[in-house]
């Protein structure tokens, strides 16, 4: 759980701007391969994210502005049933962000490593989203 000094609308806008992830997070490249509904970054959108190693392809499966966003991993890690969900709730003048990931490594021997990589990736993403959301709020936008 993270406290963000920005309203949920701002945090949601930053969180779901897939094309800008490489500017805000440790990702080297972020591409929107397919647009979704009701917005380009909405349900059905497919994003390709590259840090190190193989690119991750994820599909947006939940887009409820400004409170909830979720995705599933299509390829890039030896896992199955990988779903990430971010819930944003108003908290005073800011936002409480809860980011949860459910995943099942397919190769037990490297399962611990996969979980560690996922945790580090989520931390980098959350840190970038929080920083940009707070920057926008402080700048009045």
Predicted regions and their residues:
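Hydrophobic ligand-binding cavity/cleft-lining segments
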Residues: 1-35, 96
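A short, structured loop/turn motif at beta-sheet edges
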Residues: 5-9, 61-66, 87-96
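Amphipathic hydrophobic-ligand
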Residues: 79-85
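Residue-level recognition of well-ordered beta-strand positions that form the cores
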Residues: 3, 48, 72, 87-89, ...
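Glycine-rich portal/gate segments that line the openings of hydrophobic small-molecule binding cavities
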Residues: 3, 23, 32-77, 128-141
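Short coil/turn motifs at secondary-structure junctions
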Residues: 65, 76-78, 91-93, 104-106
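A conserved amphipathic terminal alpha-helix motif
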Residues: 102-141
